[in-house]
């Protein structure tokens, strides 16, 4: 494409480029050129920009965008950009087709056994012994009616058909589950928005809509959604470890390193960038595409080599625990592993298998329970088969003394196959394969409904873990309060105003300082916009504390925008942006006479300590002594704080023109010797619904703690208003430094015993840093002082809250105020930032737990009865009263349909009236065990009575001891029908697990339950009346049906009888399904601690491997690719899909073990040459400390003595050489 304009185009030409975009068909820069530019680093990138485009404005010109106005937003222009440069979207891995899911469902071992047995049965049923030989085969073949022999194949075919039904139902469930997860994934993507400038307006658009040429505003906490080049930056620091492996934050500036890469985190500062690459063309996209494509191409080869590899290298591939990757929203790649085996292998294995968090409580309990039930079922089915075979052999060859005739062999084998099928059906019924389905359905249903309750669940298991929560550590601002801040009090010109004063009451020079200081020393992204509806409140955009200060100016009848127009963001000389360590923000202005003025704002106690002067009543600065400061603290700040106000101090300092220029990087020397302008009290009202929500939590046995950065008096006042603290209670309120002093020993190390003395009584942690929050959360989780280990939920919104959110059992991020980094580290996103939504999450979590318990109570009752009936019946009557096909139908009711019916019960407020279950609470309580055994007893009595006396009662032929291929009997049909109807009515009983009397309460609120129960009943009628030979059923009369229904309904009456027996009397009942025992935990926790300690080190290596793999295909020779592949690609499994760039960096990608594999360097000679060179080959610093493009004095003087192929210091290739 031809250049649209010369590189030295005047700045005015940039503004006109928007108009040109409408009629000029081509851009002045190609996709390939942009990709090549974004692959360069630091000095190489600067050289390329200077040589080819002049500066970043030259790139804006070629992309036909304005650095100040952005794109016009014209749909035709946006479409053309997407067509040329691509869409900001990485295509997800194709979902599994329905046929693939069917194939996966067919892999079930019990179903395979059943299929084989059915095929054998089918084949043998066509064999008939020669005429006249029937008598020789003994009684086994007697009793067949004429024509019945020909229908012997039906049972085998019916079993196959039933297996097909089960497989189709399973596949359909998996398909709908996957569809739902993809829906959740797209919902998460839609939630991700980014701030851009279009048509001169600052707007937020979905990440997928960002296109090349957009001017994006980046700020602290953002996860960059695309590649770009910096136009203007304020103290911008980026965490690039996810891509380059460098664990140190990288300072971005126009004169050193202006390239911003997708998938990296903004850790400090703010700025604007022009987007240069999106989607698969961004750096994240390129690597993702290469890994994905490479994996698919090599997948087949890998599979062929797998066996050989496993033999050659022990444990080459480590399967990582994916507790957090079930939902498809946060898939993880398989870790790499060293080829070196040896003694360290076991340690390596443990380390590689470190989960993000320990396995979810419910999963652990269910797995344990399922294994126990499975073992019992296998034992029962084996005993059943052995008894049947022995009974048959002894009766035929011992009692009847028959010889084994060759022509009778197929008949005998048919019997053995029949016995085998009975054994397998016992196993099928006994093994609770419906458990995982019930969990999935319950979680998926809950997740869908929780979205309506403003909980966007990113990790499925967080949903059920929330039901066990015993403690919530909540932020204050925005979660407990409304996050709509207003200045309500002020201390200006030595007067304490209880409401905002009139502008006339303030001396003009103080007012001037106040207006300028607030206007320029608040982020320019913070602003107050007119209300959306007439009569509504003005909209606060950006940081809410800054909006309160801007609101103060409006109350003083001054317009901050006039000041900002006069001093645009580009003109700010230096900005010390706010972070959790500074707790302040400062901005330096350069005056026309060469002097400087710095404005500071921040926590009052921090800024006041740096003030040596204060503006007096007449507007003059006077000395501010320590005792004056103490007076202000006592008479102004403490009274404000006790009313729950946040106090902010505003100050300034002048640097005269004649003095040498200060050392701007030495912040401590700059932000000191200040003159105090004012102290303001900002009110952030408690959300009206919060006190009630906290009361519910306390009633539900959940302790709520407030962790805030505000001072202790403000925090205490708000905690009292919320109901976290009550007057007269003996609870602790600590400041961060006091908390640290109490929990650390003389060496400064944290001791768990010290934390254990504090946390049970701690309710408020004020002036705390994110590190304090992490320490508290970890201390509570690791504590063993209480009987139950604590399950902790945490809320967070800042970038530095990531560690605490990850450490917590459930991390809640704020959907509105939260940074992208916090959202990526969280399990659930609160879309309304409201504490009451957390209470709803607790309800849903407990509901999931109860739903699983309801299903277990129902299923185990069926299991016990079906297994005992099949076993006893088979041993006594030499045949199972419930046939294989009938068992499969029961299994279908029991597993799939019941799990759907019971797992979709909506939650009720009553769930919050009991204490949390905790980690070690068994899944099956003694009340549930009483219900299971009580109902099993009733059902067994009914079934055995019908089995051994039913024919007399109903005056029909007995179905016992029927010969092979005998027609279905009414007797056994009644047994089957009654058995199914008892399960159906017991499903209603199973809705209550805490001994409640009214089992029908709320039944009509669950349409799915009612539909399934009625649907099952209708299908049962069809099976019995029209099922015939395939279902081994004979038509029943109305009288027989009424008796079956009556006996089925008896379970409801029997349930009432069971409820009257107090559980406390039944001491002999055991609980089942316990969680992880206490002594099993420390190892996991220890491993997790090791993970945290080694995080930075592993982060470094992980990032390098990731970059190395992406770059080696693009930038280096084929021999290096081959060498690299031979050493590293072995043992790498194909990464699973991610659907968008934004989610690509969700989790750490690779784990490299301590014993590092040998990785060939890109060029060993270069590495040696580079070693002695100094790393300061960057250009001399610009006199403009803010690194803005407006400053024409930027010198892009770069050393040109390096060859293009060698890696310059600071580049990713160089860091690879030096580190790897």
Swiss-Prot record:
Modification Phosphothreonine, positions: 1116, 1165
Basic and acidic residues bias spans: 312-325, 337-356
Induction entry: Up-regulated at the proliferative phase of the mentrual cycle. Up-regulated by estrogen.
Name recorded for this polypeptide: Plasma membrane calcium-transporting ATPase 1
Modified-residue entries (Phosphoserine), positions: 8, 17, 338, 1140, 1155, 1178, 1182
Modification type N-acetylglycine: residues: 2
EC number(s) per entry: 7.2.2.10
Cell compartments where the protein resides: Cell membrane; Basolateral cell membrane; Synapse; Presynaptic cell membrane
Similarity comment: family membership: Belongs to the cation transport ATPase (P-type) (TC 3.A.3) family. Type IIB subfamily.
Residue positions binding Mg(2+): 475, 477, 797
Region (Required for basolateral membrane targeting): 1118-1220
Keyword Hydrolase assigned: no
UniProt-annotated catalytic positions: 475 (4-aspartylphosphate intermediate)
Polar residues compositional bias, start-end: 1200-1220
GO biological process: calcium ion export across plasma membrane; monoatomic ion transmembrane transport; negative regulation of cytokine production; negative regulation of cytosolic calcium ion concentration; positive regulation of bone mineralization; positive regulation of calcium ion transport; regulation of blood pressure; regulation of cardiac conduction
Effect of mutating residue 789 to C: In MRD66; decreased calcium ion export across plasma membrane
Broadest EC class assigned to this enzyme: translocase
Chain segments carrying region Disordered: 297-356, 1160-1220
Membrane topology: Multi-pass membrane protein
Catalysed reactions, semicolon-separated: Ca(2+)(in) + ATP + H2O = Ca(2+)(out) + ADP + phosphate + H(+)
MF terms in GO: ATP binding; ATP hydrolysis activity; calcium ion transmembrane transporter activity; calmodulin binding; metal ion binding; molecular function inhibitor activity; P-type calcium transporter activity
Source organism of the structure: Homo sapiens
Extracellular side: 127-154, 387-418, 877-882, 949-971, 1028-1039
Subunit structure: Monomer. Dimer. Oligomer. Calmodulin binding. Interacts with PDZD11. Interacts with SLC35G1 and STIM1; inhibits calcium-transporting ATPase activity after store depletion. Interacts with YWHAE; interacts with the monomeric and dimeric forms of the YWHAE but prefer the monomer form; this interaction inhibits calcium-transporting ATPase activity. Interacts with NPTN; this interaction stabilizes ATP2B1 and increases ATPase activity; this interaction controls T cell calcium homeostasis following T cell activation.
Originating gene: ATP2B1
Organism domain of life: Eukaryota
